[in-house]
């Protein structure tokens, strides 16, 4: 079945696919039937807690629906750039932005590789092609253990 989005993109829906409105999508999230959610965030701590908003005095953002998505999904994956636009690490020992909820993320994917929270360090489970351990260690704001 072909579906054309509001912006003109065409998608081929597979059997089992569903299109729902905003309120029903959050009903699915709250029901506990969501297997995986993929989110972005400003920072993620080595403990796995994500800081995904800033306060008003920080001039940007609010948590939106991500606390509900993270709390309602069985598995939480973060997809983000390894450093912010100023070159500061986004994988850190302790977040400088507010932590939205204590939920621990399961996997962090950046352009440098795949990482899991390890408590006081990150576990690099896979590095991107051509990326060295030294590059990962230099770009990360917490210790990194390589699996």
Protein language model annotation of sequence segments:
Residues 1-147:
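Conserved phosphate- and dinucleotide-binding cores of soluble alpha/beta proteins
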């Amino acid at each position: 079945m072909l579906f054309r989005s509001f912006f003109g993109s065409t998608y081929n829906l597979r059997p089992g696919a569903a299109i729902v409105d905003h309120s029903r999508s959050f009903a699915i999230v709250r029901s506990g039937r969501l297997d995986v959610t993929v989110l972005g965030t400003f920072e993620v701590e080595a403990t796995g807690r994500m800081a995904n908003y800033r306060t008003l005095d920080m001039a940007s953002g609010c948590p939106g629906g991500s606390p509900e998505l993270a709390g309602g999904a069985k598995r939480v994956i973060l997809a983000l750039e390894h450093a912010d636009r100023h070159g500061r690490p986004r994988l850190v020992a302790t977040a400088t932005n507010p932590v939205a909820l204590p939920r621990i993320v399961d996997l962090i994917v950046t352009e440098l590789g795949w990482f899991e929270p390890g408590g006081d360090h990150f576990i690099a489970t896979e590095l991107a092609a051509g990326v060295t351990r030294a590059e990962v260690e230099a770009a990360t704001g917490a210790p990194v253990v390589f699996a």
